[in-house]
Amino acid sequence: CYMLLYLGVFSRENMQIEGFWYYLFLGTFEAATIHYAVAKIFGPLLFGRGWCGYACWTAMVLDFLPYKQPQKPRKEKLGILRYVMFLLSLALVSALFLMQVTHLEKIMFWMFLAGNAFYYLSGITLALIFKDNRAFCKYLCPVTAFLKPMSYFSLLRVHCDERKCVHCGKCLQVCPMNVEVNK
């Protein structure tokens, strides 16, 4: 809540991915830049994608929805949408800089509000369509473009002990993110 309400609303600092690009292009290290560097770029080297499960405010809201376990397997082809979102956010902020738009701080604040509204509405819509609370995380979240490559080198990650695994599939049935631990 601190990052979402205090930094985002009261301090008017965009904590979404667009805010990260904005402050990075400015060459300033505001809270958004530091947050992305620690939690989403270098943090996954230690904790994997722990951010998603324990600290993401979008996932927190989506976890109140009734679909704790996905009803169907993940639709792998839709995962490309997260990279489209990632590139769109980069392109949008880049365009604002290249066009030398005035009042960029005010625009970034409204982008923060609109971005969060879009994330929550699309997350709820996807959850209802796919009957999966974390459908937004799996298919649309642009932050995973940072998290995914770094988490491959993570020190802390879920592993399957092949000597004890009976390949019953129960772990996959109860995992909200469809993580296939035995692969």
Language-model segments: which ranges?
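Non-ligating segments of multi-cofactor redox enzymes
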Residues: C1-N182
